[in-house]
Amino acid sequence: MTKSISVLIPCYNSKCKGLVATLQRQLNKEYETDNIFRYEIIVADDGSDRNDVIEYNRQINMLPHCRYVIRGKNVGRAAIRNFLTKEAAYDNLLFLDCDITVANDLFIRNYITAESNVVVGGLEIGGDSTLLCNNIRYLYEKASEKAHNACNRAKAEHKEFRTTNFMISRQLAKQFPFNENIKWYGYEDVMMGKELAAENVHIEHIDNPVILDDYEDNATFMAKTEEAMHTLKEFEDELKEYSTLLHYYDIFRKYHLTPILYAIYITFGNVIKNNLTGNKPKLILFNIYKLLYFGTL
């Protein structure tokens, strides 16, 4: 059983004091059970520009063994996680996104009793389906939720590595830092999964999910999606065989059909995007749009 843990949460314009308080209560219970157990929670603010968020999160510093570190400049998802690794005091690092909820009272216990050096807990899709029926992020995540239970994730352990909710030994985190060359949004976790695979590092997948119940609006999510396509284009060679979209794009390229993708995007791209950012998005168009958009890069 793990005797010490650093919980590391990168944060940008998100109020996460409630999440930290929940985690601290669970960690303190472990300490009360075993006084040898040591823990800390570090929240690193990656250049937030909302003063109300910063002031609210300052309350984290009042919780035992918790600290809120304010970084004046936004350095990106990879660099802020590497910063947290350097700040951590203990040998096991639990990385969590800031916009999630922990509802399982045994969440921390499930991690500290895991035996592997890399453990991925997974994601549960929360929220009111009636209220979110026209949110494209919710529709996308909900449609793929069952495919990402621990059993299915374990079948492709490295390709299914995600940074939303995972624990890694500090030694491995330092040996395999996140790729800070990734400046756009997305794929830093896919890249790390590939690097772990190259060194035959086992990734254990368990059913210990956090809950995603905070969804950006459709326009914001589509902007992030387009940004992720730029990342995929920039690191296309490195991410081959780790992207379904690249697999299908290569089929078009093999048969010299990529100009067709470009032509379809020029003709229908705005129409499709207007649907996806609108009030009644059609999920079937989402992956089509990604492929078409990628074809223009």
Question: Model-derived features: where do they sit?
Answer:
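Acidic donor-binding segment of Leloir-type glycosyltransferases
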Residues: 23-70
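Glycine-rich, basic loop-to-helix element that forms the pyrophosphate-binding segment
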Residues: 71-88
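Short aromatic/hydrophobic "clamp" motif used to bind/position activated sugar donors
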Residues: 93
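Conserved donor NDP-sugar-binding/catalytic core segment of glycosyltransferases
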Residues: 105-135
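Short, flexible, basic/aromatic active-site loop/helix in glycosyltransferases
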Residues: 122, 138-158
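Acidic donor-binding loop at a coil-to-helix junction in glycosyltransferase catalytic cores
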Residues: 184-192
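Active-site donor/metal-binding and catalytic loop motifs
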Residues: 199-236
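Non-catalytic, C-terminal membrane-associated alpha-helical segments of glycosyltransferases
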Residues: 227, 246-297
